[in-house]
Amino acid sequence: MERIIMHYDMDAFYASIEINRNPKLKNKPLVVGENIVTTASYEARKYDIHSAMKVSDAKLLCPKLIVLPVDKTEYIRISNEIHNLILKITNKVEFVATDEGYIDLTDVIKPENKKAFAIKFKQRIKELTNLTCSVGISFNKLSAKIASDINKPFGFFIFENEKEFIKYISDKKIRIIPGVGKKFFEI
């Protein structure tokens, strides 16, 4: 039996929490971070602002950028709510950050129920937190992670098998693989 692995990734997690707290921030470019961008809203990403860049560089790209401090306590509180929901589904989970994780659904759902489960999971997260997440389902963690990035934000993608996955990545740049970034090409 082929494994069913789901990767979930909260969409612009810290920025989305701040927008929930202050709805006037909706549709505005904002980042969470002090010297370094921890999370950028989707509006900020339109200016090529991304995580791990200097806030000063981000402000050069978008002079009207709103910069908010990190509220780790609140982010962890909401992350724990999500974790508790997931642990009601199964304990075969690997939480890799406050905003993402892998869930082994092999013993939880039938293969033909992947799409329905992905939709229901996203809806349940939205009901619980008023936040959106993206989901990828596949046969292993790497392909599930790549799948979760395909239809962001608030989307999902499913690779039914290895053949589908290989076909999808065959014409993509190596950067699609998590962990392969600029530094990789400097080696």
Regions found by a protein language model. Name each.
Residues 17-19, 43, 143-151:
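Short acidic, glycine/serine/threonine-rich loops at helix termini
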Residues 151, 155-173:
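A short, charged helix-loop
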Residues 108-109, 138-142, 164, 174, ...:
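Short acidic/polar capping segments at secondary-structure boundaries
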Residues 103-122, 151:
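Catalytic palm subdomain of template-directed nucleic-acid polymerases
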Residues 9, 135, 170-187:
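Helix-hairpin-helix
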Residues 91-96, 114, 126-134:
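Short secondary-structure capping/junction motifs at helix and strand boundaries
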Residues 124, 128-145, 149:
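Structured, non-catalytic alpha/beta "coupling" segments that mediate domain-domain communication
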Residues 1-98, 102, 109, 121:
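Residues that scaffold, gate, or flank divalent-cation-dependent active/transport sites
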